[in-house]
Each structure stands twice: as structure tokens, then as C-alpha cells.
Amino acid sequence: MNKVHKPLYFYLMLFFSTTIIGALLLYLPFTGKKPISFLDALFIASSAFTVTGLSPVDIGSQFNILGEIVILLLIQIGGLGIVTVTLLTLVFLNRKISMKNRFLIMVTWNIDEPGGVIKLIKHLAIYSLVTELIGMICLCLSFIPKFGIGKGLFLSLFTSVSAFNNAGFALFKNNLIDYSSDPIVIITISILIIFGGIGHFVVIDFINCKKLSKLSLHSKLVLTTTSILIIIGAITFFLLEQFNTMQHMGLVEKIGNSFFQSVTTRTAGFNSIDIASINKSTALMLMLLMFIGGAPLSAAGGIKITTFAVAFIFVLNYIRKENNVSVFNKEISDKHIKLSIVTINISFLFISIITFILSIINPNISLIKLLFEVVSAFGTVGLSMNLITEYHGITKIIIIFVMLCGKVGLLTLLRTFIPPKSPKNYRYTKGQIYL
């Protein structure tokens, strides 16, 4: 077994064992207000640990405070990454971090060099906890007057952690629909989602950089693409839904909720409107945003905005017949271009196959609704068109598999189980293919 496969196997073992432990805790009677099947407990644990947000039951009425704390911890560990939490524990105990463990972080976060790995996870932990604390304080302004100090504090903490880690779990029966007119909740959660979705690397780079022109290429690409997608998504959602799901709202409220849904759709999965009632055209737009997802080195899922941006720039440059693929006066390497194209293709193929299988198992459900659920699970978003309560046992197992694949990454899984070929010392002559 080569040096790449050993960390991958260990990472997957940590990942699956944590999910199983979480499921067992949620299944036990002392964490719930009423009995729950183990499959539903496994589904919720998987959804929390992959920071997706899908749930076959209302977690607010299903679980007591202990169960909600278990879900909260799964979200936090899943957002930071189980490997990151493990190594942070070793750092806290003043234990030496071996090269094997450093390589494990590199594999987990797709980092090319081992240098600065410990500094990276320290910054990640501090950034996450500080941002979540600030978000909690802001949400307290709305929740404490409504629920009192004790419950208000916990709701603020849970919602802040869920938002920053792009999980989309809420302890309210209708998610955030009842708070669609509350500016404190909508704005705070939107900011938390954005900060969680762009990653700490970009934020630290932005803070340390005195001029925007001096930002790293990664930060420029993440910030630019994120801004464009949020604006386009908000405008499109407003135009498509202003006379549908938002017809009862005023103009300012429509704009605010359009912005919120554009932000949350790519990564988090909170909803301030009824997703089951949106137009088909809106559903297609939301699926595209969920497929793209957030930034690398963050809690967000999807193919990642940098992958989308690089592929888009490559196609644009190819149409223009430009020899080099470049952006912001920097050339993009062939390695990253190939990786982006491969990621998009295998993700599209995976989603298509899973949707095809689910359409056979659930012949009475429309294809667009099934596709929406699969894309949401794969992008670890958590938006649902209210189909989740209708899932059969086999459908739940498939969706769990999709969530895990979306969180771990298809390429990571394929590299784990498909051994690499030895490099060849020769090359074949080029052949002609007509396209």
C-alpha cells in the first residue's frame, strides 16, 4: 500500500466510525423524546457529520437537549474535519505531530505541501470558534427576547454553528420560514454562511493584505466567483419567485429573502421560503448553485467554486483560441485544469446514475424532484422538496451514501479503491480521432 492510500484508508475509517458512533448515540433512548429507527438515526448522524442538513424527522421535536448536543458536536466536528479535530487534540496535549499525520491533513484538505499544516489547523479552529461566537451573540438579540435566556442562548449557539459550518440544521419546525421577515436572523445567518463557505484561508489573506491587488490568486478567484454567483442567484430567484413563493412579501422582504436563498443554496440548506412550492425553473437554477457549492478549505460541499471557475475560464479561452489559460494575470496550470474537468465530469455522471436508480425505486416521484434531492445531498446542502419523509429504506441508504461521497469527495474515494498505475518510460504515437 503506497503512502497516499494509507492516509486515505485511515481518514475513511475515522469518518465512518464517527458517523456510526453518532448514530448509536441518537438511537439510544436517553437522547430522544420518542423512539427512532436506527436507519433514521444513521441518516441524521450522516447528515450532521457531512454538514448536509437533511433529516427524515423534525429534530426539534424528536430529540431532547442531549440529542441536540450530539447533533451540534457532529456538525462542529464535520465542519472542522475529523482529522483536524484529532490533530488539534494532539496539539493541545503537546504531542508531536508526525509526518504521517501531516500527510493525512494534506490528503483531507487537498494541500500540496506539508509545510505550515499545524499553523493551518490552528488558524482554522480559532477562525471557526470566534466567528461562531460572534454569530451566536448577534442571534441572541432575536432569540432571547422570544425564548428566554436559557433556550435563547442554546438556539443561538446551535443555529450559529449550523450556519457557519454550512449545515442547514435548524431546531425550528419550518426551518427559517417563520423568520423570513426578521432582518437580524436573515442577515446574521447569511454572513455566517458566506464566511464559512469561503474558508479561513481567504479571510486571513484578505485581512493581512493591504491592497486587494496583492491578494493571492486563490482568494481573488473565490471572492470574485462567490460575489458573481450570489448576485446572479439573488436576481434570478427574485425574478422567478416574486409572484410565487414570495407574493405575500413586501419589496424589501423579497430582496432580502432572494439574497438569503442565493447565499444558502450553494452550501448551507437553510430555507426562508417553501422549497416544495418553487417553480421548476427556480429548481433548476438552485440545482446548479448546489452543484457548484462553496470554496475549498471550507465546510462547503459541491464541486467547489474554484473548480467551476477554472473550467469556465478554460472553456472561454478555448473558444477564443487562446493558447494559455489565465486569470488575474496568472496562468492556471494544466494540472488544475485537468482536475477541474475530471471533477465536473465524474460528479455529473455520479449524480445521473444515482438519479436513474432512484427513479426506478420511486416511479411515482417526478424526475426533477428526485434530481433535486440527489444534487442537494451530493452538494451537502440539505434543501428538500419535502420528499425526505417519503423515502423508502433503500432510498435513505442511497442518500446516505450520496452525502458521504459528497463530503469525502468522489476523487478521494476513487483514489482509495483504485490503485495507481506505475509510470511508463515510453509514450505511444498520436492517433487521429474525429470529434
Annotate the PLM regions.
Residues 1-435:
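Membrane-proximal intracellular helices of multi-pass ion channels
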